[in-house]
Amino acid sequence: RTRYLERISGPLLDRIDIHLLIEPVDPKLLLPESGARGRLERQRRLEEARALRDQVLQARAAQWARNPSGLANHRLEGNALHEVLALGRKEKELLTLCAERFSLSARSHSRVLRLARTIADLAGSDTVKTDHIAQALAHRRAGQTLDGEEDQESDRTLFSG
C-alpha cells in the first residue's frame, strides 16, 4: 500500500476527496448462508441499503434546497461555500489548527469544508459541527501524517481534544 501511494503525486492525491483504509474481506463472508438464516441476513442487508439510500436522498434534498442555484455541496466555491457553512468559533479553531498542523493546501482546505458540509447533511444537521470537520479531515488523511507514516493515534488525540 505504501509503495502504491508513493507513486501517486501529492497534487493528484489532493484532488481525491475521501481516502479510506479498507481491510480485505474474509472470503467466507462472501458466500451466502442458506436457509432461513441466509434469508434473514439478506433481508437485513437490504433494509440497511434502503435506509442508506433514504439518508442520501434526504441529504441531496437538503443541499438543493439550501445551496445557491440548487448546487450540490461539491460544486460550491468561495463565498457560496462559506455562506452555507456558517462555522462557529470552535469549528473555525479546529479547522485552523488542523490546516496548520497538516499543512493543508487551499484546495484541501476547501475540499475538507465541502466534505464536512456533506457529512453534516447525511447526519441531518443544519450546521457543520466539530465532529463533522474531524470526520472530513480523517477521511482526507486516512493513515497519513506529515511525514507520510501511519499515525492515527496522534490524530485521535487532536480530534478528541
What are these language model-derived features?
Residues 1-149, 160-161:
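Basic, amphipathic alpha-helical bundle interface domains used for macromolecular binding and assembly
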Residues 155-159:
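Extended, low-complexity, charged intrinsically disordered regions
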